[in-house]
């Protein structure tokens, strides 16, 4: 099932919102939200969490940071940098794939725990892409694309990229 999510100024519009509310009242969904840096993953995740009264949300950046306390930089250098500032001895795409594969077991563990506890969960982040996480572990996978400007990209890279927006119902 596909849902259309649009951004207009500071508003997130989910065209099939009523359908989502009905579905989420009946089940505790496990949701993944992927997309490039600055696409609005955190914004959409927070809007879904708040307005659909879901239980938990975590970003892959938080998961990556936790993993860096347990893994050595010499073996997992891709976890010790941001996706938009990859390590220098490999291509950005290779860095992205390595990062996605490195955090996949931790993401899958979070999904398994949420399912076992009967709680809803949103995981959002750059390192989420189809084919990396086992399909049977989640209910919905949103991939966002960015139509942002260079100015918005600079805000994201330099900081202050997460802003509050309202959900149009």
Language-model segments: residues:
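Extreme N-terminal, non-catalytic leader segments
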Residues: 1-30
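Hydrophobic anchor at the beta1->P-loop junction of P-loop NTPases
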Residues: 33
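The conserved Walker
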Residues: 36-37
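Conserved glycine(s) of the Walker
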Residues: 40
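Hydrophobic positions on the alpha1 helix immediately C-terminal to the Walker A/P-loop
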Residues: 44, 48
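Post-Walker A helix-loop "phosphate-sensing" segment adjacent to the P-loop in P-loop NTPases
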Residues: 49-60
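Conserved nucleotide-sensing/catalytic segment adjacent to the nucleotide-binding pocket
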Residues: 57, 69-119
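A glycine- and Lys/Arg-enriched "phosphate-lid" helix/loop adjacent to the NTP-binding pocket
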Residues: 139-169
């Amino acid at each position: 099932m596909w849902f259309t999510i649009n951004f207009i100024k500071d508003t997130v519009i989910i065209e099939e919102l009523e359908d989502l509310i009905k579905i989420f009242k009946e089940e505790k969904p496990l949701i993944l939200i992927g997309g490039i840096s600055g696409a609005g993953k955190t914004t959409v995740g927070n809007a879904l969490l708040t307005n659909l009264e879901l239980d938990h949300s975590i970003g892959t950046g938080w998961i990556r940071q936790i993993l860096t306390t347990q893994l050595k930089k010499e073996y997992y250098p891709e976890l010790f940098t941001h996706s938009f500032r990859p390590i220098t001895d490999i291509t950005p795409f290779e860095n992205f794939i390595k990062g996605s594969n490195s955090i996949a077991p931790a993401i899958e563990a979070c999904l398994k725990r949420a399912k076992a506890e009967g709680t809803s969960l949103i995981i959002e982040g750059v390192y989420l892409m189809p084919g990396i996480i086992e399909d049977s572990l989640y209910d919905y996978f949103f991939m966002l694309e960015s139509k942002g400007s260079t100015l918005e990209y600079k805000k994201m890279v330099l900081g202050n990229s997460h802003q509050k927006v309202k959900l149009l119902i």
